[in-house]
Amino acid sequence: MALLDLCGAPRGQRPEWAAVDAGSGLRSDPGHYSFSVQAPELALPRGMQPTEFLRSFGDDQERKVQIEMAHGTTTLAFKFQHGVIVAVDSRASAGSYIATIRVNKVIEINPYLLGTMSGCAADCQYWERLLAKECRLYYLRNGERISVSAASKLLSNMMLQYRGMGLSMGSMICGWDKKGPGLYYVDDNGTRLSGQMFSTGSGNTYAYGVMDSGYRQDLSPEEAYDLARRAIVYATHRDSYSGGVVNMYHMKKDGWVKVESTDVSDLLHKYREATL
């Protein structure tokens, strides 16, 4: 119950946090996206509007410059008859500088929800970890898991409150709920899209080319793994900001499983040898 204490709830069950009985006459008002948390300011970073704060240190000409983040990645996800496949590269770059090649760009929100990272790593990690907290609070309050649609809507609402403040995030939220597998795209403008297949990051055009040529709804698990694997490998080969290893997850009815973490260089050599 430490999470409840952190969010301002006293010991014991709070009446307004409990599920409201339809005949009780009580009102259930979850607030913005914080599900009646007493201190929602915990979810809001303090300080000035970030873009204006940074511009205040420059001269008149520099204050008119658009702040641009230096980043790059390749992430993808698609639905098929056996669930959802999520595959990402692992290179973290800042322009031409490669910071590390061992970043897991999949945020494990809970056993039935996954989120991907594309854009500014700090923004993606912070907001998706906050989403994980909200999903946990939803479970504690309602006694059931949040749906994939509702989780993606929460993240979209968070982004809408910070539109124009310099956030950089393009995330895919995927999971399994009562309606089956779900896949949504959410970005820093609050855009929220549902679809069968998405790819984000600087290498997404190359990944889409591979996926479009081999995607079918009736893929077997092994065929789906191979399609996602090839899409990431060929994207990293053509996109200088992507690389490292292929981290792949399979979202099933009983939760996600991590399929593999394989070096893209080894896979590329394997594919080339197979064509000789």
UniProtKB/Swiss-Prot annotation:
Family, as annotated: Belongs to the peptidase T1B family.
Further comment found in the protein's record: Encoded in the MHC class II region.
This protein's name: Proteasome subunit beta type-8
Classification lineage: Eukaryota, Metazoa, Chordata, Craniata, Vertebrata
Record key words, sorted: Cytoplasm, Differentiation, Hydrolase, Immunity, Nucleus, Protease, Proteasome, Threonine protease, Zymogen
Entries under PANTHER family matching the protein: METALLOPROTEASE TLDD, PROTEASOME SUBUNIT BETA
UniProt organism field: Rattus norvegicus
One Pfam family recorded for the sequence: Proteasome
Disulphide bonds in the chain: none
